[in-house]
Amino acid sequence: MNCSPPGSSTDTERQSSSSGTPVAPRPTLAPTHPLRQANRLPIRLLKMLTAHTGHLLHPEYLQPLSSTPVSPIELDAKKSPLALLAQTCSQIGKPDPPPSSKLNSVTSSGLSEKESGRSSSLKLGESPLEDKSSFKPYSKGGESRKESGSSSGGAADKAGFRVPSGSCQPFPHAPSPSSRVSSPGQHCDSKNNESQEKKEPEANKANSETSQVNPTLTRASTSNSSAESSQSGDVTPISKADPPSLGSGHVAPVSPYKPGHSVFPLPPSGIGYHGSIVGAYAGYPSQFVPGLDHTKTSLVGNQLPGTLGLPGKPPSSSPLTGASPPSFMQGLCRDPYCLSYHNASHLGSSSCSTCVHDPSALKSGYPLVYPSHPLHSVHTTLSSSVTPSLPGHPLYTYGFMLPNDPVPHICNWVSASGPCDKRFSTSEELLAHLRTHTALPGADKLLAGYPTSTLGSAASCHLHLPPAGPGSPNTLPGSLSLRSPHSLGLSRYHPYGKGHLTTPSGLPLPSLPAGSYYSPYALYGQRLTSASALGYQ
């Protein structure tokens, strides 16, 4: 198949060779001539193939079609079900446009982006009046406000929670807000002080609105690079280089990956809060809550970023950044009975058992507030806030291994009267003490009903029951009449098991002592005591 036009030189040579008579050559067309280009075979094939495809939907189905449709089917291409479905799918995730037109929606979205960009350039004390500071967890990094840093590179945009306007506004639960503004414990700038007086009613309104939603979410994740190294000699819990200028009612965050200050509110040290503070902080013993000394935060600022930081990751890449102590400690160890803390060697000191009676501030080396069991917090709330209810160090209520502790083994049993918290020097004494807690009423009669001694020894081994005998001092008197050998499962609760415990109709179901529960760790006493010594990774 020849791709050259009829007037080319190849046709002339073929005709002269076939007929033998010379033929006058035709005038040769230039290669770029339109007539010659139109006769080329690829152009012809493309025209033939595209002649009957005008009625099909174009790939760009959302674009306006040509003004001269090839076929009448193309007239309703925008109204076809496939095109409507494609348009609907393309609108998923977009905000609802106003009823006027799409052009207005585009311009309004552009204006809202400008407004958010303008508000991001404002400082904390200069927020506009129309901003109600609602909690926006999905706000982008550009929409969060910039912190007013003292140094040049000390402030940066940080995606986090929106803070109520003004960095020094009073917490609504604390009394006398006007005295809080003029207290010497707040190193606010003059600009922030002026804006505070103007915006105090709005700050109270916004703060109360936000705290009604969730009191634990009214905190800001601030980023400052110079707050760790610069510490002043004041007695207030802030340093002079901190941008947010938090008052004495705010506690430094227990975030191991980034130094700085979070804004979860607590009462100042002058206010004698007894027991727990508000809902989310009920798990904290009252003697640690009232204040933190910023000169004692060496563990938060220096030790934890080096020891707990993940290798190869920047300090701000952790999901725990800026978190409050409950989520931080549950993220590190999700077990409420966790017996060790793998940085405990930095925490131990020779005077650890003598520094627990000061409710105003934590002593040196103990800036962290460890969460305790909820039952223990109830017991601590009922007890005096000045005299701790624990014989040992109250930060380590569940057997934290201190290197200089002469009696490191602590009983973790919690009942209605509070935690036991007795200390023992050896694990054998602790296990012998645990058997007094786990003794079932009438256990001697229960074990005496079985003929084989192997079953009784296995039950006393796994359930920590005392050996059967009439003179056993640990057993409690009581009637325990059970009909099936499944009664050994009395100490455990099986949610999916069948009800094997059938009692006679005249006898009530025997139960454990009132108010106490069976500790799952009583079965693993040896493992726990050895794990606390080994670090329990």
UniProtKB/Swiss-Prot annotation:
UniProt main location, coarse: nucleus
Keyword check for Transferase: no
Keywords: Cytoplasm, Developmental protein, Metal-binding, Nucleus, Repressor, Transcription, Transcription regulation, Zinc, Zinc-finger
Gene Ontology CC: cytoplasm; nuclear matrix; nucleus
Compositional bias segments (type: Basic and acidic residues): 188-203
InterPro entries: Elbow/Noc_ZnFinger (IPR051520), Tscrpt_rep_NocA-like (IPR022129), Znf_C2H2_type (IPR013087)
Compartments (UniProt record): Nucleus; Cytoplasm
Stretch list, region Disordered: 1-38, 90-254, 300-323
PANTHER family documented for this protein: ZINC FINGER PROTEIN 703, ZINC-FINGER PROTEIN NOLZ1-RELATED
Family of this protein: Belongs to the Elbow/Noc family.
Protein name: Zinc finger protein 703
